[in-house]
């Protein structure tokens, strides 16, 4: 049983590391403002993915998707989208999709 748990943990760890190192950040601008919890944004040509500091109601004529509980840009990729602006909805971004899925539509 212990061996099975160890193998499962190692497989998950390797898979997680692979996800972080394989994302193509080209064409995207990453910004971070260091606060008690960081303010994070990843900007693509069609809009941006932001952390919980951003309110979609203030994203007038902007396609933005919001993820929360993140501390790094890599965390943003794995997190679930919690809110979307009207313009982001027009691009096909939906609450519940991953940050990676949203970024590919905002790229």
Q: Which role fits each region the language model picked out?
A:
Residues 13-15:
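N-terminal signal peptide c-region/cleavage motif recognized by signal peptidases
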């Amino acid at each position: 049983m212990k061996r099975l748990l160890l193998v499962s943990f190692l497989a998950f760890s390797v898979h997680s590391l692979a996800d972080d190192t394989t994302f193509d950040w080209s064409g995207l601008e990453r910004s971070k403002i260091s606060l008690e919890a960081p303010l994070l944004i990843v900007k693509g040509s069609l809009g941006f993915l932001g952390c919980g500091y951003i309110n979609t109601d203030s994203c007038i004529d902007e396609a933005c998707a919001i993820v929360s509980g993140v501390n790094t840009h890599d965390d943003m990729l794995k997190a679930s989208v919690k809110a979307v602006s009207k313009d982001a909805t027009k691009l096909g971004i939906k609450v519940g999709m991953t940050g990676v899925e949203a970024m590919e539509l905002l790229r």
